Amino acid sequence: MVNKLSNLIKEMRNRTNLGILECKKALLENNENIELAIQFIKKSGTLNIEKNVNNLSNGIVLAKVKKEKKYGALIELNSETDFVAKNKQFQNFGKEIISIILKEKISDIDILRKFMKEKISYFSLTFKEKINIKRIKLFYGKNLFNYIHLKRIGVIVDIKNSTEDMSKKIAMHIAASNPKYISVKSIPNIIKENEKMIYIKSALKNGKTKEIAEKISNGKMKKFFEKIALEEQFFIFDDTKKIKNIINERNIYIKKFIRFEVGENFYPVI
């Protein structure tokens, strides 16, 4: 039980950047259900309490995959201003960080921050503003592909039976469309149930019958799935087809992905 809670706390810290005590409290108050715990802290506004380095809104996202495509890393490095984010020294510092993550296989952000403490202090003094390694992800897979959009959005996808061109297009789609899950099936039931209940309650409140409310909720759930499930989204390079049509036609298998965008509060859910 202790190990399970510890693992949940670690995962929640990675996804929210909150401290150990805040994560533990949220998990215990929600029967150790991580999805409910995250919803709980969203509603409580806990994520907005810390107006410090974790809330710097400028910066860069970088991604790198090793040559053998078995593992890669994604980082968000923050600064106070866009001016510093565009500085070559700052961007090179980001590249140095990602190289260290891959070389040492560092997955714990606290260890990385401690490892880079002196350099972070140096660059903070150099630029005269706060610098923060907001989040990192050491990502393992079978055939990884990465894509960076303007150093603002980064994606790594584990994809099988795909050409280089199609892998890039799918990664670009993920960057542009911001899905949270691969498929409807992969969305936790608690999220689907809560979302549907919101639509049903809204329809009933507006005087609809239960039957009509159910139909309305089904239609809205379809739109909801198109927004957050990769396979349900229309492909940005061919909007007559959904991603699921593209991958089925080509026998492509997308095992997992991760997406970072500068300024986000949470990790995208894989």
Curated annotation (Swiss-Prot):
Keywords: Cytoplasm, Elongation factor, Protein biosynthesis. PROSITE patterns: EF_TS_2 (PS01127). InterPro entries: EF-Ts_dimer_sf, Transl_elong_EFTs/EF1B, Transl_elong_EFTs/EF1B_dimer, Transl_elong_Ts_CS, UBA-like_sf. One of its GO terms (cellular component) is cytoplasm. It holds the Pfam family EF_TS. It is found in: Cytoplasm. Its main location: cytoplasm. GO terms for molecular function: translation elongation factor activity. Residues 81-84 are annotated as: Involved in Mg(2+) ion dislocation from EF-Tu. NCBIfam families: tsf. Associates with the EF-Tu.GDP complex and induces the exchange of GDP to GTP. It remains bound to the aminoacyl-tRNA.EF-Tu.GTP complex up to the GTP hydrolysis stage on the ribosome. Belongs to the EF-Ts family. This is Elongation factor Ts. It comes from Wigglesworthia glossinidia brevipalpis.
